[in-house]
Structures are given as structure tokens and as C-alpha cells.
């Protein structure tokens, strides 16, 4: 998809900011079919490393997925720890099988491992620098993760969390306004409509966005 200069960057352009070789749109860089990323989500690398370098212990045999929505901002050094990092916990945690030389016969089956499922990140999520996201975590739309947080549990939509251990800081909006943002789902609108309404999206003018959405639904 090619957009002219009046309609924002091309989401298929890996390096969308001229002269900046660190900030990269993620989707066009992905080669792993178990990593699914929406358009316009970016990773601001430290030294030009690829986003996939930040997804650790992601083994095909396990089949877990990393799923990220649209318009997410992911800070430098953020890492995603997938289920392959988990060791057995019902006896010794030492991974004898990795060293082979006769120990390979003690390879655990998947049912023996404490698998947590996919990592799922919603849309319009802001993740600060050097955040660690653990296996199976679900982060809701519009959430903010403070720098250097270790995310070990689910994060509700439009909430702010941080720290290690992870702590809830506050909601970004009242419950009613959060429900309105979630119902609106502006990130799923056609890009032409998003561009026309960017002032309202950026300024959080939910009432104007609701009126605009109603007009669209009525046409």
C-alpha cells in the first residue's frame, strides 16, 4: 500500500523516518509465521537490531504465538519471553536433555512443561524501554507499560502498570470512557477515515469520534 505525503507513512516501509535507522515498522520485517503484527506498530531498536531478535525462546515445536495489534509503540530493549524458556518444575528444573551425550532420552514432552499460551498485545499499546514480557501475558488495548517493567500477569485495557514485581498504577480514563474507546476501535477503521480524524484521535476527543462513527454507520 502506497500512501502519499498527506496520508502518513507507507506501513510496508521498514524504516519510515528518513535518517533514522533504529525505528522500524515491525510487520514487514517478520519472517516467523508464529509472530503476527498489525500495521504501523513499531520497534525503536537500540542499535538497529531486528524485532525478531527480541523474541526469545520461541521454538517451532511448541507452536506458541506472539500477537501484536496495530499502532503499538515498543521501546528499545523490550524482550518477549516465549514458552520455550520454561523448565519442568515437578522435579529437578535442570534441562539435562539439552546436553545430549545420552541425556537426550530425558527430553520432556510438551505436557510436562508449564506452558502459558500465546503472548497477546492489543492495539495502541505503549511499551517503554527495556520491558520484559513473560509467556502467556495478555495486554489490553490502549495500555501503557512503564520502562523496565517485568510483565508477569495480564494488563487491563487502558491501564498503566510498571515495576518489578508488576504493579497497577492507574487507569487512563474512567470506566465509562474506556468502554467508549473499546467500542469505537478506531485502529480498525479504514486508513482514509483515520487520517481524516487524526486530530480527534490524538486529542482524545471521544465525543467527536463517536459522532463521526455514527455518521459512518448511518451511511
From Swiss-Prot:
GO terms for molecular function: acyltransferase activity. The active site is at residue 87. Keywords: Acyltransferase, Antibiotic resistance, Plasmid, Repeat, Transferase. SUPFAM superfamilies: Trimeric LpxA-like enzymes. It comes from the Bacteria. InterPro entries: Hexapep (IPR001451), Hexapep_transf_CS (IPR018357), Trans_hexapeptide_repeat (IPR050179), Trimer_LpxA-like_sf (IPR011004). Pfam families: Hexapep. One of its GO terms (biological process) is response to antibiotic. Its EC number is 2.3.1.-. Inactivates the A compounds of virginiamycin-like antibiotics, thus providing resistance to these antibiotics. Belongs to the transferase hexapeptide repeat family. PANTHER family: ACETYLTRANSFERASE, ACETYLTRANSFERASE RV3034C-RELATED. This is Virginiamycin A acetyltransferase. It comes from Staphylococcus aureus. The gene is vat.
Amino acid at each position: 500500500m502506497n500512501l502519499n505525503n498527506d496520508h502518513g507513512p507507507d506501513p510496508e516501509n521498514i524504516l519510515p523516518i528518513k535518517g533514522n535507522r533504529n525505528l522500524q515498522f515491525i510487520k514487514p520485517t517478520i519472517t516467523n509465521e508464529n509472530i503476527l503484527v498489525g500495521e504501523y506498530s513499531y520497534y525503536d531498536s537500540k542499535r538497529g537490531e531486528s524485532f525478531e531478535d527480541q523474541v526469545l525462546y520461541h521454538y517451532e515445536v511448541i507452536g506458541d504465538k506472539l500477537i501484536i495489534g496495530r499502532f503499538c509503540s515498543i521501546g528499545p530493549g523490550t524482550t518477549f519471553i516465549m514458552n520455550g524458556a520454561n523448565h519442568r518444575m515437578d522435579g529437578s528444573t535442570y534441562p539435562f536433555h539439552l546436553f545430549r551425550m545420552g541425556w537426550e532420552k530425558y527430553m520432556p514432552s510438551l505436557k510436562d512443561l508449564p506452558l502459558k499460551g500465546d503472548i497477546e498485545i492489543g492495539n495502541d499499546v505503549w511499551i517503554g524501554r527495556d520491558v520484559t514480557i513473560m509467556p502467556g501475558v495478555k495486554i489490553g488495548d490502549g495500555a501503557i507499560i512503564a520502562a523496565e517493567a517485568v510483565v508477569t500477569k495480564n494488563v487491563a485495557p487502558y491501564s498503566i502498570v510498571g515495576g518489578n514485581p508488576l504493579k497497577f498504577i492507574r487507569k487512563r480514563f474512567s470506566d465509562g470512557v474506556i468502554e467508549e474507546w473499546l467500542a469505537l476501535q478506531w485502529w480498525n477503521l479504514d486508513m482514509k477515515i483515520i487520517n481524516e480524524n487524526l486530530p480527534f484521535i490524538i486529542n482524545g476527543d471521544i465525543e467527536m469520534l463517536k459522532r463521526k462513527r455514527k455518521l459512518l454507520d448511518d451511511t
